Amino acid sequence: MTMQAVADAVGVRAPSLYKRLDGRSALIRAIADDVARELGGATAPALELEDPGEAIRALAGHYRGFAHRSPGAYQLLFSNLLPEASPSAEANAAAAAGLLQLTERLVRRERSLQAARLLTAFAHGFVSMELAGAFRLGGDVDEAYGFGIDAIIEGLRISGAER
């Protein structure tokens, strides 16, 4: 990706990009921040759902759908090939805020980060394998994803009951 290619794609001259961004690294960071915020913005409708399990299911479905609609943008978030491709701390915090609120409904507040990491690790691992075509044993992949999310929600509910 070059500044010239981006300028051409958005219909401006490359020098005008440099007025807004401090080079290619800043451009990539801005894209990563935008992707993180877009993914995090999906929590808003889920937060309106009363049942936390349903809310997490809705969020997990959006997460997976986003990865399928925008695999390049999705992979950018989790790549360590370019340090500048990591979203800023502010964008990461904004992206995670809704998920943390949802997990706090199921577990003690001090465990919500661990619960959010568990959900993210499962969803990311599953989606990454799915995008790579790694599920080769047959069966319904949609059903498998739902089963995994449901199992995690049930485990979190049990853990949360120990408050």
Language-model features, listed with the residues they occupy:
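Append "Primarily bacterial transcriptional regulators
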Residues: 5-8, 17
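Amphipathic C-terminal alpha-helical segment
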Residues: 121-138, 154-162
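Amphipathic alpha-helical packing segments from all-alpha helical-bundle domains
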Residues: 84-118, 142-154
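Amphipathic alpha-helical segments used for helix-helix packing
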Residues: 68-86, 128-136
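An amphipathic alpha-helix adjacent to DNA-recognition modules
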Residues: 11, 20-44, 57, 61, ...
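Hydrophobic alpha-helical connector segments
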Residues: 44-73, 93, 116-119
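Short alpha-helical functional segments enriched in proximate histidine and acidic residues
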Residues: 38, 42, 66, 102, ...
